[in-house]
Amino acid sequence: MPNIVTRFAPSPTGFLHIGGARTALFNWLYAKHHGGRFLLRIEDTDRKRSTQEAIDAIINGLKWLGVSYDGEIVYQSKRIERHIEVANLLVEKGKAYCCCCPEDKVAEKKAKAREERKIYKHKCTSVIPDAKPVVRFNVPDSQEIIVDDKIYGHIKVNSDQLDDMVILRSDNTPTYIFAVVVDDHDAGITDIIRGSDHLTNTFKQVLIYQALDFDIPRFAHVPLIHGRDGNKLSKRHGATSVCDYEKMGILPKAMRNYLLRLGWSHGNDEIISNEQAVKWFNLESIGRSPARLNFKKLEHLNNHYINNMSNEDILTLMLGESTLTNKKKNYLLQGLTELKKRANYLTELLDLAQFYIKDPPFDLSEEAEQVVKSNLDIIKLLASFLSNIGDKNWNKGFLSSQVKEFSKLHSAKISDIYHSLRAPITGVMDAPGIIDIMIILGKDECIRRLQAV
């Protein structure tokens, strides 16, 4: 399928929603699968609600996700002259007309029609001097509008169910329904992949394409993402924006893999690399039912990708711009191998690794504090006992044998000795094996921590 061109066209009125992120991913994968191009257009004609902060969040969110666009970003607000030109062309062709009817009166009539379960067909005939008219599209009567959707199949609606929609407001700014058609045509968009909530818009836009003698692109309307309860996704279901997941410590690869599997499948494959996704992606494998968020699956994927990343890469992501001594970085590089098995999020991993970063004396967990209070004498004896071990013998085998020897010497349970080491050295009671930690920290640091309590 040659010359495929897809696009992602968000409105910058908020952060990048995961539904939008999935739409962008699907468009990107479809274009890459066919060797085509993927474009980014910012639909910012609503100047009151569009913000630079939201634009930056969209661009940064796509970059974080690894979804790269081709060419320059197109800003819809910079194309208004083109939209006006095409609207005037439709008026000249008799496909659109100027309407001076007050908007509140039109809204009132629409509401009344809805109450009577009728379709309000607005046809303006009034001319008001000095009024600033809107431009309405002249919807033809009794015309069958057909959409061969790549997901939902053959869908049709009668034009009598549609009203004459506004395509140009009284301030000469275009409406979404109209600007999208002009922009997609001028950009050479061949395939439009978007949420199923746009399906009603598609019937209206097909009429505009036909009125302008534009080639109609192929459409694929993707079912929306729902919460676990089956209701439309909202903030009450948890994180809904890409930046929320980034802050939680989700890896881009995990998020991309998770979004890919929300409504699309390739047999029983769960872990899908970027290369496999590009190779396998097709529209036929997108289901018609809404996908449901499942945070457990996302956690599972994130844990998988955390454990398949090198400790060096994980450390870079964890620390960001923060500075640590080389000694502490070395602690982390060695300790992450065990710690990352326990973490589903980078933030969780950073919390688990705090005992490698902090200097004694540091805060103890409630349980660790109780162990220290109950075993102060033993801890002091351990510090003295360990100081007699030579640096060359500071290895797992020798340390383990010495702990057993100490246990016998003081008639104490070996588990109590391990607890008496773990509590002051790590400050927590659920860290990995204490002997492994002691090997990483080294003799001097372990004794320093034992003495600090």
UniProtKB/Swiss-Prot annotation:
A motif ('KMSKS' region) lies at residues 232-236. ATP binds at K235. Pfam families: Anticodon_2, tRNA-synt_1c. Its main location: cytoplasm. Keywords: Aminoacyl-tRNA synthetase, ATP-binding, Cytoplasm, Ligase, Nucleotide-binding, Protein biosynthesis. One of its GO terms (biological process) is glutamyl-tRNA aminoacylation. Belongs to the class-I aminoacyl-tRNA synthetase family. Glutamate--tRNA ligase type 1 subfamily. NCBIfam families: gltX_bact. Catalyzes the attachment of glutamate to tRNA(Glu) in a two-step reaction: glutamate is first activated by ATP to form Glu-AMP and then transferred to the acceptor end of tRNA(Glu). This is Glutamate--tRNA ligase 2.
